[in-house]
Design a protein with these regions (language model features):
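Two-metal-ion RNase H-like nuclease active-site motif
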Residues: 34-44, 228, 358-360
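A short, Lys/Arg-rich alpha-helix, primarily the initiator
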Residues: 956-975, 979
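Short alpha-helical DNA-recognition segment
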Residues: 975-994
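Residue-level detection of the helix-turn-helix DNA-binding "recognition helix"
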Residues: 998-999
Length: 1020
């Protein structure tokens, strides 16, 4: 076994499993939609955010035939009078021609409707007429127009069903009309939601005719054509855009305007709202026209993401999903590959020490890996053949690994395989609990608990090549297999992307063609600048969407019912288990491809790391496809604690490479360029534009300060050593600071503003302190650090049940309202609170002076508390919460827990300088989990306080019982004093511990809690 510098004890690890559930079904193409209703709402600015008024446009064949306003029932007489006067004095912006060929006139008058009449219009156009119902941020506007809601069931479970129609019963009470549909909305993330009409009692026969059919079908429910412009803009651009940003990007003539004051009905405010609807209407036309250029069969309302469009292109080329056309492909290989899946590398290597850098990144990393490894041949193969027992072949391959071997592009196609190894100091990605209760992936020296083959883990061959590059040793291989594509699937079809870029899946590598055609656009004279930019953006989006994510897609099911399923993982045989919220593989999910692609990305970074290290250098940070190499114009030693070099005077240092040396490394990667050199002539490793002055084009000295993974800043220094952050449209093309860990917080100076310059202020202070320069106190440091959360699910809304009691829907905190979230300081929990399950939320309020007095409610218990930023600790009724100053201080000291300091001990908050890899011993057995990326936005913003709450764990009953038996034996061997100490450490009562000793079974959560206490404590 390899000797370790520090053994910090065994860490719990987790590996992914492949759950054998039916993949999600592809969407059918919808018929041509003629009519469109576009609407937008304005609201009160109080905590209820109730509808005041809105406006709409009704279009047929692109011509506006009616424009109108609608208003809430509870307006004051003065507010209603204002709207009535406005409607009388302003004409509608309709097309005076109407549609004469159909005999449809337009209405020149600006219509004014009560909200009930607008709901009827919506029903008539969107349900009976099957027109397009359109808004920007659809869930919010739909929820404003509703008269109530219930929690959704079945396909929309985890969402809300909004009610739009009611009637009065015999006693005069309002009742929901069951003969009219509701609209169900299930939040996916800030850009996407599932939407659809719900079923109604005794629907008309015509409403039961499926799309594209002519006869009614019993049980059919028309779900509607509901388009969120924000979602479609995201699907087309892979960017999260505001209405203003989308209008600018797509060249809308009448874009969004601004208004000084919201919530008060004035003629100016009505103008503002009408302009929003006009902007939305013009944006819809632009987006729909852009979407129509894509030669795909996907209904526009089902284009939820770039991946949706990417999959539709595969379908258009008749590229069927691998598991659909090869249903007999052994799922155990999918399980082995899924357990070998790890996301991109991300870490800080030089911590909290500003160092000069050259910032580099790999061109379209995942697409490039696909081309290098020939993975398109797998996507289009007639058959994928598995060759087992490749241990000797793999060992021989690994013995040849050197940098030059990896730089030989012909070797990459030999790496389509997986192996189970017994780690013994090999440098490998490992998903472990390095700190706290969440899983993180670190690339470290991994050690098995024993030499036994059953203690082995599966890895993709590129990860093993990376380990050999970084350690010089071949791992102990227990099992190995490789994959090979055989032939081509039948029926593949060529197409023209957006009608302009021909792609033939039979003879071309799709991933390669997308990159090459994008590069060739600059030389095309047949395109306008606008169309060239749009085509370039579309090709980039398509390449990103199809090169990785669709092969890794797992869709979490929201049902709270336990589902029995079969899981494939690290073992030759699968196991059966029951879980809540299982994950179904996506339509194109194929774990071998997903794992090979990400491991190929790891290998590129490992090769870059090795080439830098061979020249005596290091890097400040790495992030998936980028690396900030410590480098200066002439190179030399740079002061850095923990560095391997010594400067005059005895200070520890790292070596900065020269710009020339970095350029030499970049040139080496030209050998791995798999593209047509007439289109892409240079290296796949790029020196980023940030390194060059945008005015002169000359290279400039960048500096980097990294705290931990994804928390770093790039900056310049003037002649006096003063730092200057990289700022978009000031001295750079993009901002040079990370928002990770801060982006969910409100602007402390103006909570209604989307301006994030306060984060730049914070980073500048961190940089100045690291340079030993004077720093001005932040003016907002003492304010409560608050985030804005959307009430996106019933579980977020339930804590407000007491606050909402006996109030009308308009007065309630409603679905898709904005609410506030704060963060508990260390030792700040109230005395009776469970720190593991405690999160305070409050009604939305824009006035910071009122934040401390709001009713703050624990999301778990529903109890109400007060908050303070000045108490030392929490009390029975008061929670000590973090101020912006507290958050930023923690941010600046956030440890890089998956790395080690110079001595080999785990990095902590005080660690400064050069980090190294940890030596990690695996705690066996591993935990078997699903994807880590469930509800990432909610975790970031705070509505899901603990990432562990959204992992799906697939317990293996075979291991579970063996492990529990060992725990029970340990309990039986403990003395009374040891049991009492265990009670304190675990929080599990002595009575329960004794019952388990006698043989009573325990819930899996309690088993995990007990195992953790036994692992962390010494009971002497």
């Amino acid at each position: 076994m390899v000797e370790r510098s520090v053994d910090a004890g065994a860490l719990p690890i987790a590996v992914r499993v492949y759950p054998d559930l039916k993949p999600s079904q592809p969407q059918r193409k919808a018929p041509q939609i003629d009519g469109m209703l576009v609407f937008d709402c304005e609201t009160r600015t109080d905590r209820a955010q109730a509808l005041t008024f809105g406006s709409y446009r009704f279009l047929v064949a692109g011509r506006c035939l009616e424009e109108g306003l609608f208003y809430a029932d509870d307006l004051t007489a003065a507010e209603r009078t204002m709207l009535e006067r406005y409607a009388r004095e302003h004409a509608a912006d309709t097309d005076p021609r109407g549609i004469p060929e159909r005999g449809i006139p337009s209405n020149p008058d600006l219509v004014l409707l009560p909200i009930a009449d607008f709901r009827t219009l919506l029903y008539r156009v969107a349900y009976k007429g099957r027109g397009l119902l359109c808004a920007f941020n659809f869930p919010f506007d739909a929820s404003r127009c509703a008269l109530g809601y219930v929690e959704s069931r079945d396909r929309f479970l985890g969402g809300f069903t909004f009610q739009f129609f009611h009637y009065r019963d015999r006693n005069g009470r309002l009742r929901v009309n069951p003969y009219r549909p509701g609209i169900a909305v299930k939040h996916m993330d800030s850009k996407r939601a599932l939407k659809g009409f719900t079923g109604a009692i005794d629907p008309d026969k015509v409403d039961q005719i499926p799309e594209g059919d002519i006869k009614p079908k019993k049980g059919y429910v028309f779900r509607g054509h509901m388009l969120d412009l924000r979602t479609l803009a995201f699907a087309l651009t892979d960017r999260s855009l505001s209405l203003e940003g989308a209008c600018d990007l797509f060249g809308v003539e009448h874009g969004k305007q601004k208004v000084e004051r919201h919530g008060i009905i004035t003629p100016v405010y009505i103008d503002y709202n009408r302009r929003d609807v006009l902007a939305s209407t013009e944006l819809a036309a632009k987006l729909l026209a852009d979407y129509a250029l894509h030669t795909i069969e996907l209904q526009v309302t089902k284009a939820y993401s770039p991946a949706s469009i990417g999959k539709a292109y595969l379908q258009a080329m008749a590229v069927a999903p691998i598991m659909a056309r090869m249903p007999d492909f052994p799922k155990r290989y999918c399980g082995h590959a899924e357990s070998a899946f790890f996301g991109g590398r991300a870490s800080a290597r030089v911590r909290k020490v500003p160092v000069p850098v050259v910032y580099t990144d790999f061109m379209s990393q995942y697409s490039t890996v696909n081309v290098l490894m020939g993975l398109w041949n797998f996507v289009t193969a007639r058959e994928i053949r598995v060759t087992e027992d490749c241990r000797e072949e793999l060992a021989a391959l690994l013995r040849d690994v050197k940098p030059d071997w990896v730089l030989d592009a012909s070797n990459w196609k030999r790496l389509a395989g997986f192996a189970r190894i017994v780690p013994d100091g090999d440098v490998l990605p490992l998903r472990a609990k390095y700190r706290g209760n969440s899983w993180q992936i670190g690339v470290n020296y991994v050690h098995a608990r024993s030499d036994g083959p059953k203690d082995g883990l599966w890895y993709a061959w590129p990860d093993l090549v990376a380990s050999v590059l970084l350690t010089g040793k071949v791992p102990r291989i227990v099992e190995a297999f490789r994959l090979a594509p055989i032939g081509k699937a039948k029926g593949l079809k060529k197409l023209a992307f957006r009608g302009q870029v021909p792609i033939d899946p039979r003879s071309q590598d799709f991933f390669q063609s997308v990159i090459e055609e994008r590069a060739r656009l600059a030389a095309r004279t047949d395109l306008s600048d606008t169309e060239r930019d749009r085509l370039r953006r579309s090709l980039k989006t398509l390449g990103s969407a199809t090169s990785y994510g669709i092969f890794a897609q797992m869709d979490r099911q929201e049902s709270d019912k336990e589902v029995a399923l079969t899981c494939y993982g690290i073992d030759p045989e699968p196991y059966r288990c029951k879980v809540k919220h299982p994950e179904a593989p996506g339509e194109y999910c194929f774990p071998p491809l997903a794992s090979l692609i990400t491991s190929g990305g790891h290998l590129l970074l490992a090769l870059l790391e090795r080439l830098v290290a061979d020249r005596g250098g290091t890097y400040a940070m790495e992030d998936t496809d980028s690396m900030a190499i410590v480098a200066s114009q002439r190179g030399g030693l740079v002061p850095c604690p923990g560095g391997p070099y010594t400067m005059k005077g005895g200070r520890e240092a790292v070596r900065a490479l020269s710009w020339e040396q970095v350029a030499e490394i970049v040139a080496l990667f030209a050998q791995l360029n798999p593209y047509d050199r007439t289109a892409v002539p240079d290296s796949i490793l790029k020196i980023e534009d940030d390194n060059f002055d945008p005015k002169t084009g000359k290279q400039r000295q960048l500096w980097c300060l990294a705290i931990s993974a994804k928390r770093y800043v790039l900056f310049l220094r003037d002649r006096n050593g003063e730092p200057e952050l990289l700022r978009k449209n000031v001295n750079n093309g993009e901002d040079g600071w990370s928002q990770h860990g801060l982006g969910h917080l409100l602007n402390p100076s103006d909570p209604t503003s989307e301006d994030r310059s306060w984060i730049a202020q914070a980073w500048l202070g961190i940089v100045r302190r690291s340079l030993g320069l004077a720093t001005e106190p932040l003016p907002f440091a003492d304010r409560v650090a608050l985030g804005q959360i959307t009430v996106s699910s019933p579980e977020v809304l339930r804590p407000f049940a007491k606050l909402n009691a006996d109030k009308t829907y308009a007065q309630q905190i409603k679905p898709f309202n904005f609410i506030l979230s704060c963060h508990i300081a260390p030792y700040g929990h109230p005395a009776d609170a469970d720190p593991e399950h405690f999160h305070l939320i409050a009604p939305y309020e824009t006035d910071p002076r009122k934040w401390l007095a709001l009713p703050w409610i624990d999301q778990y218990s529903g109890k109400q508390y007060r908050i303070s930023t000045t108490l030392a600790t929490g009390t029975r009724q008061i929670a000590r919460v973090k101020s912006y100053g507290d958050v930023l201080e923690e941010y600046a000291f956030h440890e890089e827990a998956k790395c080690a300091d110079a001595s080999g001990a785990p990095c902590d908050k005080q660690t400064v300088g050069l980090l190294q890899r940890r030596h990690v011993t695996i705690e066996w057995p591993p935990r078997f989990i699903g994807k880590e990326s469930n509800k990432l936005e909610e975790i970031e913003e705070g509505s899901v306080p603990d990432a562990g709450d959204v992992y799906t764990e697939y317990l293996d009953p075979r291991r579970q019982e063996r492990d529990w038996h060992r725990v029970v034996e340990t309990l039986r061997a403990m003395t009374k004093r040891q049991l009492r100490e265990l009670e304190k450490r675990s929080g599990i009562s002595l009575t329960t511990l004794k019952a388990w000793r006698r043989g009573r079974t325990a819930h899996s959560n309690n088993r995990a809690k007990l195992a953790g206490a036994l692992r962390d404590g010494r009971f002497g």
